Amino acid sequence: MLKSRTKSVSELFGLPDPPATGRERLVATAIELFYRRGFGAVGVDQVIAAAGVTKTTFYKHFEGKDDLMVAAVQRRDEWESHAWGRAVRKIAGDDPIKQLLAMLDVMDLWFNDADFQGCMFVSAAAEFPNPHDPVHQAAAAYKQRTRDHRRDLARAAGAESAAAETFADCYTALIEGALVLRQMNGRNDAARVVRPAVEQLIATYLPQRLQEKQQAPNRRLKTIG
């Protein structure tokens, strides 16, 4: 776990690059408004006004709100995937097991951040429940990618293919449950609540790797002796 609680989400995540073009301003503004108010509550005119661009600029880049919503979800996906990966590596380095646990440390910081407004991808899927809707598909693509990343870490830690798939599904269910616990029940400690279950998953599906870690200090002591 994090040794210091002084690190903030912004310190770990970093800030998105400032938008340089009219299209980027529109997308960045849409992300902010959709995240805070919801997709259905924000109209195109509000985004245009907040972005400080003209309607001509908007329709030069987007056919309408649907296109903007998809672009916003996809851009949030790109930034968040990079930011989370960087934050986890800052804590855990390249060790896959440490990274799997560090994800909970980063999530704990996020859950306790003053700007926490829930998960934009969950909100997008909830507002657009049809699995064929482009907004739903963009949100689902992010969730699938994060699930697959956990599977890849399990494989890197020594899990067989089938075990890694099961591990990823179970870990993802715990993470999504923690999100619901935080967002609906206001439990700031939700990431810490699921941590013992994640540790048990690791012990169950990656026992050989854990055993190697536990034996390493003993081997060093024997070498020194």
How should each PLM-predicted stretch be described?
Residues 78-81, 88, 98-101, 117, ...:
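Amphipathic alpha-helical packing segments from all-alpha helical-bundle domains
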Residues 1-21, 155, 208-225:
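N-terminal intrinsically disordered/low-complexity leader segments
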Residues 98, 137-138, 156-172, 189:
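All-alpha amphipathic helical-bundle segments outside canonical DNA-binding/catalytic cores
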Residues 71, 85-113, 167-171:
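Hydrophobic alpha-helical connector segments
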Residues 162-181, 193-201:
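Hydrophobic alpha-helical segments that form the core
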Residues 128, 182-185:
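Secondary-structure edge/capping motif, primarily at the C-terminal ends of alpha-helices
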Residues 2, 25, 29-67, 71:
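Helix-turn-helix
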Residues 87-89, 106-111, 121-130, 153-154:
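Helix-loop "lid/cap" segments that line or gate small-molecule binding pockets
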